[in-house]
Every structure is written in structure tokens, then in C-alpha cells.
């Protein structure tokens, strides 16, 4: 599934987020003509209706610890297909991002850390 939330994201559900070879997959996916301008790649698994394990490989950067736009893309997609409720937490290697949908608005909350 792809989503546009200010920047493009390819979202792929996998069985084991931690062991999936994201770097190799990202190189292969970005070679496709449909992604000629680059794309951020999210791999994920829904743990429960409230928790989503995820990792991200951002175009031009590589794998990062977390991604706000990626979390929004995942949340909106999974909410649309009724896999999560109106509140969910995306669990990235770098920390948790809390997402909610209230009165036709999306909210994203998380800790900011400078690296």
C-alpha cells in the first residue's frame, strides 16, 4: 500500500519487523519505475488494535529510528481498513509515537530527542 502525507510512503506488512532485511528490500523497491522519485518505506506488524511495530527506511537517508509522517501514513491506512481504532501507538526502535483521530483531525504525539 502507498500513501501520501506530504511525502510518499510504501507500507508493507511483515511477520517479524525486527529481523526483516529492510535495507535490501528498500534498494529493490526503489529500483521500480513507479518509485523513480524515491519513496519512504515502512514495514510493520499490528500487535493488537492499539499497537503497531514498525521500522522505516527514508529516501535519501536510509533506516532511521522513527518517522512522524510514516506513523501518520500507517495509522491512517490501518484505521481505514479497520485494523486499529481511533487511538494507536506506533512502536519504532527509537521510541513510541501516539496517534489519535478526533473530530476529523489527526494528532501525533511523541518525545523529541536530538541526536
Residue spans for each PLM region:
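Active-site proximal loop and beta-alpha junction motif in alpha/beta enzyme cores
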Residues: 1-66, 73-115
Amino acid at each position: 500500500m502507498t500513501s501520501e502525507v506530504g511525502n510518499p510512503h510504501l507500507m508493507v506488512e511483515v511477520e517479524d519487523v525486527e529481523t526483516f532485511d529492510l535495507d535490501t528490500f528498500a534498494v529493490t523497491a526503489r529500483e521500480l519505475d513507479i518509485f523513480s522519485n524515491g519513496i519512504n518505506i515502512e514495514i510493520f506488524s499490528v500487535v493488537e488494535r492499539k499497537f503497531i511495530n514498525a521500522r522505516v527506511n527514508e529516501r535519501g537517508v536510509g533506516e532511521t529510528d522513527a518517522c512522524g509522517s510514516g506513523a501518520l501514513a500507517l495509522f491512517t491506512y490501518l484505521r481505514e481498513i479497520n485494523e486499529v481504532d481511533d487511538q494507536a501507538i506506533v512502536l519504532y526502535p527509537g521510541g513510541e509515537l501516539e496517534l489519535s483521530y478526533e473530530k476529523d483531525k489527526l494528532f501525533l504525539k511523541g518525545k523529541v530527542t536530538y541526536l
